[in-house]
């Protein structure tokens, strides 16, 4: 369910505690993490995989905005070709304006504070499982947000869908 004012918010890449790159796609309407990926490197393939998982999950309409900062992975020809091939529109933060990426920065801050800070993982798979658990079992179904009336992303979307029926 979307409001029609729906866009995915693609963050800068971030090195996680397990020395992996992590990328997410967040639906700005509900604050739900709708796509994510982890790789050994923070590269174009990482952000493509994060958005591709959102495309598979949500099947957005053509013209859906994908917002990012101005990092090199988001200005590459591969990135732009990927977006165009899926009917997605690139939107970028203004240079030096961190506020455009606030929802994603907030998510990564919560992930670090609530789950991965001061933890070490014996394997990459263990780190990936921890991130999966946080996103799919806690953040999306249970983590409340002030921007959604203190509802979790899943509950916010459920209530929105009920209003439309």
Predicted regions and their residues:
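Charged DNA-binding/catalytic regions of mobile-element recombinases
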Residues: 1-165
């Amino acid at each position: 369910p979307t409001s029609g004012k729906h866009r995915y918010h693609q963050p800068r890449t971030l090195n996680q505690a397990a020395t992996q790159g992590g990328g997410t796609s967040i639906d700005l309407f509900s604050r739900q993490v709708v796509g994510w990926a982890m790789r050994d490197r923070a590269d174009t393939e990482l952000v493509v995989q994060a958005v591709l998982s959102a495309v598979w999950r949500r099947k957005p309409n053509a013209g859906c905005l994908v917002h990012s900062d101005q990092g090199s992975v988001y200005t590459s020809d591969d990135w732009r070709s990927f977006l165009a091939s899926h009917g997605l529109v690139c939107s970028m933060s203004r240079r030096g304006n961190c506020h455009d990426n606030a929802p994603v920065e907030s998510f990564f801050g919560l992930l670090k504070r609530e789950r991965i800070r001061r933890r070490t993982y014996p394997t990459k798979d263990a780190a990936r499982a921890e991130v999966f658990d946080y996103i799919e079992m806690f953040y999306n179904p249970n983590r409340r947000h002030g921007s959604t009336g203190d509802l979790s992303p899943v509950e916010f979307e459920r209530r929105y869908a009920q209003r439309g029926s």
